[in-house]
Swiss-Prot record:
Its EC number is 2.7.1.39. GO terms for cellular component: cytoplasm. It is an enzyme of class 2 (transferase). It comes from the Bacteria. It is found in: Cytoplasm. SUPFAM superfamilies: GHMP Kinase, C-terminal domain, Ribosomal protein S5 domain 2-like. GO terms for biological process: threonine biosynthetic process. This is Homoserine kinase. GO terms for molecular function: ATP binding; homoserine kinase activity. Belongs to the GHMP kinase family. Homoserine kinase subfamily.
Amino acid sequence: MIRVKIPATSANMGAGFDTLGMALKLYNEITIEETEGETEIKLLGGELDRNYRNNLTYISIIKVYEFFNKEFKGFKIDMSKTNIPLSRGLGSSAACIVGGIVGANALLNEKMTIKDMLKIAVDIEGHPDNVAPALLGGVIISIKDMENIIYSRINVKSQLKYAVMVPDFKVSTELSRKVLPNEYSREDALFNISRCSMLVSALNNGENEKLRYLFEDKIHQPYRKKLINNIDSIFLKAKEYGSLGEFISGSGSTLIAVLEEADENFILKMKTYLDSLKDGWRIFEVENDNNGAVII
């Protein structure tokens, strides 16, 4: 039996639309073992997945077995230890995919390269901005060029913390893509290119004083804001209470405020404000995970 721990991830980070992603110290665990009988997948709460052939972890495992031309009969997969909120922009799908790939590779006692793991993950997920940090940890820049996945790790100099704010409503990735325009002005494109470029530099050099200007975006967040209740007032409060910057995590509905250091006072103030709103917001503080998916 193999047990894998996979971190949550947050894609985009404001100006880095479909390019930047980071791993967070919030984890799911998946256990995998081969069986002689029918595949059985246990979900959160102990419920069995009756439609397991569409399960992302199962699909990922099969892709690895096919990669190595290995035969199989069935699997016993336990996905019940889940801490990453589903469909909230924190990489729950990426965790399922990466957990399946890393787990199957270990189960077969093989040594698949990072390149091949990423290729399988992106083939399933469609883009690398969540699966890359879920696999590798840290803050990752990634691009897809034809069949190649090219990535680089940002060596974040400061020990930043992140106030993660999660409501009780979901935003589907499909809907969040649908609200985006087909064309952008040159000014908006330059706005994002300049901020994304400087964000990478500021993170790498520990220039926290610049971060206030670098999570702003004109490519996706202005259009997705209407899908998230009270986002403007939440961002204003976070700024008032000392955040270095705020952004939508992935396609939402989770929001993230960046903190220079652990700040219990910020969390308490924001919790008080969030409690005054509807939608059951909860808030917690995390930091970057730098290990990615690991066998435990």
